[in-house]
Amino acid sequence: MKKILVVGDLIADYYLWGKSERLSPEAPVPVLEVKKESKNLGGAANVANNLISLKAKVFLCGVVGDDLEGKHFISALKARNIDTSGILTDKTRCTTLKTRIIAQNQQIARVDKEIKDPLNADLRKNLLDFITEKIQEIDGVILSDYNKGVLDFELTQTIITLANKHHKLILCDPKGKDYSKYSHASLITPNRFELEHALHLKLDSHASLSKALQILKETYQIAMPLVTLSEQGIAFLEQGELVNCPTIAKEVYDVTGAGDTVIASLTLSLLESMSLKDACEFANAAAAVVVGKMGSALASLEEIALILNQTHPKILPLEKLLETLEHNQQKIVFTNGCFDLLHKGHASYLQKAKALGDILIVGLNSDASVKRLKGDKRPIVSEKDRAFLLASLSCVDYVVVFEEDTPIQLIQALKPDILVKGADYLNKEVIGSEFAKETRLMEFGEGYSTSAIIEKIKRTCND
């Protein structure tokens, strides 16, 4: 588990949800009939929350006011297992609170309560003492700057210098015009508007984007400069050349907090030794998850994997499949296998299995599972491609990949009406049969097997 220190501005996000169908008689403004209220962790706390969702250990460092919102805020952080020992109380300010008013799932107004004054000398010293104490323990640092007074120029540069001295990855989500504040950071994540504002450049072409990123690299010594481009994805430099990693999002409901998700997922990806390109693809997938939800949403590893791996709508993780089948009344048939080098025998077997019920679910052994069962030279075809081929068959309704050696957990969760296995299981125990109403054995098709196909290919190559 990676340990990440997040330093920055803490924001309480408050939402009023409802419907608006009339104007106020007092002024030409809409009247919201509130149906629901919710509170989320915002700013640097949302970055921390995203990291928790991605299975990291998080130390959060920032400031709240000496007020009820601040107390509730810290309680919410603790409930998410975020370490709050680096959060200080400032008696001279209120906890930053952003209230968003949502009507018919559209944000119609926002009300901000905040004080953006710089921290006093004592608070700055206490924050820096905490960071200095933690720096050797953690794997990376994120500076989440919302320009609310915590990350002034001097403190930001001191933290970056400290991180570099201890060879720690340090990423910054910047604000304001002066990017010298973030000089020598490992990576910064401005959006197009922020970067245009800071560099006084219009970023409307390949050449202008490349020039802007070169300035970040050469003038500000940012090791890995990039820019987020909303629906156009993320652009970065690779050996001096501009690379664009396109967005993955299909439906956008709310972009609130998407930048926090991007920097959190980039940090963890890079700490896992991913290339910058792969890290950007991972971050794009995480962002695609959160913009498809309302509010400062989170992306789980399972949801990100679904975005990255799903090349067919029939391919689902178990959690999503169970959700899809929650109110199902049709007869479910389940079978499983490696289905390496899909052949006529497989297709015939699956068609017969589907004929036994209404919905056919195929449990597919992952690459790691196949390797354990059949040896290091298998599978021939990757799990992603095997899943796609199976999902392309009209007789198959859903494909779910499992990592274990057996599908016992899938069968126990799905509780199919009929469990189908190959006829070679005659007089053998069928794993998971106790969780199905009925177990049926079925021929694959005489003369067809993946092993036979592999041997035939070998003989042909040798000839």
Curated annotation (Swiss-Prot):
Annotated EC: 2.7.1.167, 2.7.7.70
Molecular function GO labels: ATP binding; heptose 7-phosphate kinase activity; heptose-1-phosphate adenylyltransferase activity; phosphotransferase activity, alcohol group as acceptor
CDD domains the UniProt entry points to: RfaE_like (cd01172)
Residues that coordinate or bind ATP: N191, R192, F193, E194
Assigned protein family: In the N-terminal section; belongs to the carbohydrate kinase PfkB family. In the C-terminal section; belongs to the cytidylyltransferase family.
Subunit structure, interactors included: Homodimer.
Name recorded for this polypeptide: Bifunctional protein HldE
Organism: Helicobacter pylori (strain G27)
Source organism phylogeny: Bacteria, Pseudomonadati, Campylobacterota, Epsilonproteobacteria, Campylobacterales
